[in-house]
């Protein structure tokens, strides 16, 4: 008996009146994970499209894979380089034996030595990322299913995207219990309390990260959380620039200068999904081509960032090195590219109108640079900029609609 036939045979037990009626949401989630729902349109009007919500979410899920795989490779490579820089011989062996990520990597055929292969680096990075992703997926999925059972509606595939986005924007060293707590806040407080998918006004993944940032700042910011090496501390590129400008950008392990190309490719420490602008561009091209993400929002973010960063460059400052950061460095450092492509373009929390999307994107780009430059306590600004713009998105749409109504009334003399 095939899986599809099995699911069809037991479906009646989960339908209204069946003995497992209350578990319909769980059954439906499992069934639609593998197969397209068998629902058809029987009454007019018929609106047909080859891409439904499930396929949209799955395509976004696939679009972050380039950044995810590169991020795992980079996290493993950064950790191995740092470990071999600090330890050697028996001391390194003791460190490996005392950390389950390290010894699991070696048990699976990898190595932590300085000449580790790309496979070993990928494997070590996976031992950090995959447990976080699995924790986020299971805990967040539990809350999704629970609310669907209580409300008696289907499980939405949107959580596939929320879970992987959240896992990609946290440090690789984040404790698993904090990952569970963060996604709980994002799903329950930022989404389900307001009615679930389609009714939330904040991006759930960013809301969960913001909760962790303010509740547990030591585990999600600072200098010790970005490189997965025991005892290693190294400032991020944004923090280095804030301290001494472009000349202060150095690899914290080798001491070599960090070039723009290093940052663009992703050879720097950071969150798994945020380090490689190149990998993010590949994924962004997919979702823009399929019209899942709005090019207007992306262009607006770039315009806002370029204008404000150039303005700060012109003003200049003798005491704040961030004033000198040009727009092309803002693009490749921190979470700017990830936020612009995959967070700002969230179709639920972003503006709906075309003109509103432009203003929404411009606000994000401008606010991100302003937070980075003016706020000395917080070198990164994309997360707060997007959440701030989420609050204004309905206002932008309202103003656009009101202006359109007035223009049409004036046109027809009403």
From Swiss-Prot:
EC number of this enzyme: 7.2.1.1
Residues with PTM FMN phosphoryl threonine: 236
Transmembrane segments: 23-40, 56-76, 129-149, 164-184, 268-288, 297-317, 322-342, 358-378, 381-401
Presence of the UniProt keyword DNA-binding in the record: no
Catalytic reactions on record: a ubiquinone + n Na(+)(in) + NADH + H(+) = a ubiquinol + n Na(+)(out) + NAD(+)
Enzyme kind, highest EC tier: translocase
CC terms in the record's Gene Ontology section: plasma membrane
GO biological process: respiratory electron transport chain; sodium ion transport; transmembrane transport
Major localization listed first in the record, in broad terms: membrane
One example GO MF annotation: oxidoreductase activity, acting on NAD(P)H, quinone or similar compound as acceptor
Keyword annotations: Cell inner membrane, Cell membrane, Flavoprotein, FMN, Ion transport, Membrane, NAD, Phosphoprotein, Sodium, Sodium transport, Translocase, Transmembrane, Transmembrane helix, Transport, Ubiquinone
Compartments in which it is found: Cell inner membrane
Membrane topology: Multi-pass membrane protein
Known cofactor(s): FMN
Annotated InterPro entries: NqrB (IPR010966), NqrB/RnfD (IPR004338)
HAMAP family (UniProt xref): NqrB
Family listed: Belongs to the NqrB/RnfD family.
NCBIfam families, A to Z: nqrB (TIGR01937), PRK05349.1 (NF003756)
Subunit details: Composed of six subunits; NqrA, NqrB, NqrC, NqrD, NqrE and NqrF.
Known function: NQR complex catalyzes the reduction of ubiquinone-1 to ubiquinol by two successive reactions, coupled with the transport of Na(+) ions from the cytoplasm to the periplasm. NqrA to NqrE are probably involved in the second step, the conversion of ubisemiquinone to ubiquinol.
Protein name as it appears in the record: Na(+)-translocating NADH-quinone reductase subunit B
Native source organism of the sequence: Vibrio vulnificus (strain YJ016)
């Amino acid at each position: 008996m095939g899986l599809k036939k099995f699911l069809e045979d037991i479906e009646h037990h989960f339908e209204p009146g069946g003995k497992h009626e209350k578990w319909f949401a769980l059954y439906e989630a499992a069934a639609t994970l593998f197969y397209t729902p068998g629902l058809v349109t029987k009454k007019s009007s018929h609106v047909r499209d080859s891409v439904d919500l499930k396929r949209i979410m799955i395509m976004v899920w696939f679009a972050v894979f380039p950044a995810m795989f590169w991020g795992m490779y980079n996290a493993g490579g950064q950790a191995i380089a740092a470990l071999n820089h600090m330890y050697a011989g028996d001391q390194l062996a003791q460190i490996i034996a005392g950390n389950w990520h390290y010894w699991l990597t070696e048990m699976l055929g990898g190595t932590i030595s300085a000449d580790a292969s790309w496979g070993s680096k990928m494997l070590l990075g996976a031992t950090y990322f995959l447990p976080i992703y699995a924790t986020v997926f299971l805990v967040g999925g539990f809350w999704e299913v629970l609310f669907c059972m209580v409300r008696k509606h289907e499980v939405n595939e949107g959580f596939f995207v929320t879970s992987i986005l959240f896992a990609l924007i946290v440090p690789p060293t984040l404790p698993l219990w904090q990952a569970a707590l963060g996604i709980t806040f994002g799903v329950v407080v930022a989404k389900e309390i307001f009615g679930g998918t389609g009714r939330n006004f904040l991006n759930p993944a960013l809301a969960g990260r913001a909760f962790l940032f303010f509740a547990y700042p030591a585990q999600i910011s600072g200098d010790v959380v970005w490189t997965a090496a025991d005892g290693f501390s190294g400032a991020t590129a944004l923090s280095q620039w804030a301290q001494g400008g472009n000349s202060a950008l150095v690899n914290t392990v080798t001491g070599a200068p960090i070039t723009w190309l290093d940052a663009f490719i992703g050879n720097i420490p950071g969150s798994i999904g945020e380090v490689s602008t190149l990998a993010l561009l590949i994924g962004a091209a997919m979702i823009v081509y399929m019209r899942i993400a709005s090019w207007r929002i992306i262009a607006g973010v770039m315009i806002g960032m370029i204008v404000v960063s150039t303005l700060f460059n012109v003003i200049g400052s003798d005491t704040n090195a961030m004033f000198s950061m040009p727009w092309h460095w803002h693009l490749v450092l921190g979470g700017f590219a990830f936020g612009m492509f995959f967070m700002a373009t969230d179709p639920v929390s972003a503006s709906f109108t075309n003109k509103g999307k432009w203003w929404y994107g411009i606000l994000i780009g401008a606010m991100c640079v302003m937070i980075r430059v003016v706020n000395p306590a917080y070198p990164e600004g994309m997360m707060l900029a997007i959440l701030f713009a989420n609050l204004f998105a309905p206002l932008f749409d309202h103003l656009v609609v009101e202006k359109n109504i007035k223009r049409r009334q004036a046109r027809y003399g009403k």
